[in-house]
Amino acid sequence: MKFFALFIYRPVATILLSVAITLCGILGFRMLPVAPLPQVDFPVIMVSASLPGASPETMASSVATPLERSLGRIAGVSEMTSSSSLGSTRIILQFDFDRDINGAARDVQAAINAAQSLLPSGMPSRPTYRKANPSDAPIMILTLTSDTYSQGELYDFASTQLAPTISQIDGVGDVDVGGSSLPAVRVGLTPQALFNQGVSLDDVRTAISNANVRKPQGALEDGTHRWQIQTNDELKTAAEYQPLIIHYNNGGAVRLGDVATVTDSVQDVRNAGMTNAKPAILLMIRKLPEANIIQTVDSIRAKLPELQETIPAAIDLQIAQDRSPTIRASLEEVEQTLIISVALVILVVFLFLRSGRATIIPAVAVPVSLIGTFAAMYLCGFSLNNLSLMALTIATGFVVDDAIVVLENIARHLEAGMKPLQAALQGTREVGFTVLSMSLSLVPVFLPLLLMGGLPGRLLREFAVTLSVAIGISLLVSLTLTPMMCGWMLKASKPREQKRLRGFGRMLVALQQGYGKSLKWVLNHTRLVGVVLLGTIALNISIPKTFFPEQDTGVLMGGIQADQSISFQAMRGKLQDFMKIIRDDPAVDNVTGFTGGSRVNSGMMFITLKPRDERSETAQQIIDRLRVKLAKEPGANLFLMAVQDIRVGGRQSNASYQYTLLSDDLAALREWEPKIRKKLATLPELADVNSDQQDNGAEMNLVYDRDTMARLGIDVQAANSLLNNAFGQRQISTIYQPMNQYKVVMEVDPRYTQDISALEKMFVINNEGKAIPLSYFAKWQPANAPLSVNHQGLSAASTISFNLPTGKSLSDASAAIDRAMTQLGVPSTVRGSFAGTAQVFQETMNSQVILIIAAIATVYIVLGILYESYVHPLTILSTLPSAGVGALLALELFNAPFSLIALIGIMLLIGIVKKNAIMMVDFALEAQRHGNLTPQEAIFQACLLRFRPIMMTTLAALFGALPLVLSGGDGSELRQPLEITIVGGLVMSQLLTLYTTPVVYLFFDRLRLRFSRKPKQTVTE
């Protein structure tokens, strides 16, 4: 009592304490960063290596494998995957959460250095690494377009000036430039002209290489002067290469222009980028794993005016995609919902107490508790994100509960005629332990969440801590500020209510009287209620499950997968066709895409949807609509998926979820992967089934006749060099410019490589100087070859990706895949497992039951300690089954799967619904100890006296949650599962626990009496 009196009789100190809490919270709020979700990105590093012209199998065996063996020794690597395609290898390293990305980068560089001696000597550069996850959607896409500059020149501006500057911005992890390649001088050889002049391709390559040399020439000096020697040893443009003499034939000079077409072009002509049907260069910006997306985007936007000044005015620099607007809109929705929730909660208090003065008290207590929480969030390094703001919204119902219990009890004494200060002291003393029990038993609910490991633990930590801090501050405010304000603001009289509120008061009295009559009947018919309770507990609801609610971020990402033998020209046409279909959709605002590079038959598209208030469909509905139109395009597929704020793993795939097949036997993997993929494609629980295994690419297999080659004076190296010179876009020389270095690229003119007959026109100069046609010593035949070779760890791997059809959940898909694998009888040499988000879902499902049991056990222990009883905690926890059933029924009603967010709702219900039981049990025990009442009389009186605060706290929680349930703006799909579970659980538990709690209380009392052989007592009227 002295503790309460200290604050009641010292109002100035109490007010200043509350002001201090509020000011600290305001300061913390201003410094908190903004993010869509808590920081849960895995540290990911991507290693890239290239060997132009090398086949995927060559890249896998000679480049990927040595690097993997070295990189696999790094501590903290949780997953290592690689993909090798034509001339390129990419290795993705995913590290444990607690691994520092900078320390990991140093280890990666050391591993690359250690493997350098095992790599092919012909690699043009050392392997490089980037601290970014290539599977993440870019946080921003910039486009460069121009009516006067070529694509190569635009690419040069982007890669030389823009990308390095953007990479230096804090938070940027990687800037990927696509849509073309650097400028180059391209030499397109004419085979017949070379044959007529007796010039080999190696002669041309050597002549060009020797004619463009950058070497130091030294200096001259005399006694007084020094002269630097400079020569015209470099050729920089196509016009300068055109007259280059490469050979003499019968005394006549053969110039390069006589046997080739020389143009100023680009290094790789098999690249294309577009934005809204216009050729463009794309700058795809990804953030560092630990970076804040909003801060990074803001920094990039602030830099854009400066970047615009560094490029010519004829180049148009635009933002094609920015993920931050929907994030900001989502957070604004939650903030508005929080304000509405506070207003509704205060309205509930006003309706029940029907006093403006009394309503002011929780109207002050709630903001103080919530605002003060921001200070703790800042000290903990948290951010303002959807989950932390949802925690504060939910906390609105919790923090007002404490104030309501204290306020209502003090108001009851005032209505009985007690003086304000005495009523404040007496009322707070009576419910102080109750409020303490309610708060202390609520916080332990979140301990299991705090102890969770991996992604779910990281994701829920901010939510749990934020809510716990808000409850702690609320406990302090309810026992200090609330009784002080009651003692000094309220009067010792019945509240004078307005006429329009009298009807509500009469309704409340009638409701309480009706409850009292029904409760008397229930207490004399406990077996019937027991049957209802047991039936409720036994109800088992099968509900679909998923990892995280499918978000509508306003951004779609699409992967194009075409026939494996498609040409680049045809693939570029597919990109244009798909972009037109999507651009014509009324819900689409912007479309960008690119194709080419080492994967000729694939491409990527990024689609920005119109804001939510300008479209009526969700992202998934738009995907479903587009899927029908896109399926009509022959020879290629475009797989669309909505970009999510959480994406696990480093695999680049064409769908949201992955199932990986591993085998040490590559032949077995290639045999079984098509069977498994075709089976999964027939399952109704899956959509957009596709695979990264591409082993049916068209190949021309040349077989050398070595005996004939030896007889003709030709070696294998000369023959291979011929093929590389002719068809490999071989980089044969370097052009040095002040800002960058450019290449001279040689190949047979594409006009002469349109079909297989191009091989018949190739010839090799033998050791006698004679031109020997390739067909003299080689035979060729078409065959199939892999377009890519994939590894996970050191095993061959193939990843099957899939999306979920509308109405299906991840648990449905998971079970269907397991059944399909069993039905197919896949041998033990081929192992299947979920990857990425699907893998985390499996791990989370396995731990959910344990989490709920741990939360209940923790609450039981705390309640047992507080009440010094093994029995009373069971009475209080008997409210949980009905709440759980109500939550699951509500999810079924709204057709919402059980996700990680719904799990939070179940955990919260454990803390919410037991408050009603605590208020009943606490007053019943007090009445038995000090009022000499029988257990039946005590629990009956407790139920009646606590009916009003129980209704107030429950309705406050309901009204606090309703805005989130009913909100339909940005991010609503993330918030609604939490509120659906809470509202459903509260409604069900409120209907049942007002009756089941007193019945359970009496059941345990009778059990105690039976063991102590005391006579049974009956209800007294």
UniProtKB/Swiss-Prot annotation:
Q: Which UniProt keywords apply?
A: Cell inner membrane, Cell membrane, Membrane, Transmembrane, Transmembrane helix, Transport
Report whether Endoplasmic reticulum shows up as a keyword of the record. Answer: no
Extract the Pfam families matched here. Answer: ACR_tran
Q: How does it sit in the membrane?
A: Multi-pass membrane protein
GO molecular-function terms, A-Z: xenobiotic transmembrane transporter activity
- Write out the transmembrane intervals: 3-23, 333-353, 360-380, 387-407, 431-451, 463-483, 849-869, 893-913, 949-969, 980-1000
Alphabetical GO CC annotations of the entry are: plasma membrane
Q: Which domain of life is it from?
A: Bacteria
- InterPro entries cross-referenced by the UniProt entry: AcrB_DN_DC_subdom (IPR027463), Acrflvin-R (IPR001036), Multidrug-R_MdtC (IPR023931)
**Can you say where in the cell this protein is located?**
Cell inner membrane
Its family remark reads: Belongs to the resistance-nodulation-cell division (RND) (TC 2.A.6) family. MdtC subfamily.
Quaternary data: Part of a tripartite efflux system composed of MdtA, MdtB and MdtC. MdtC forms a heteromultimer with MdtB.
State the protein's name.
Multidrug resistance protein MdtC
- Organism, by scientific name, is Shigella flexneri serotype 5b (strain 8401)
Q: Which gene encodes it?
A: mdtC
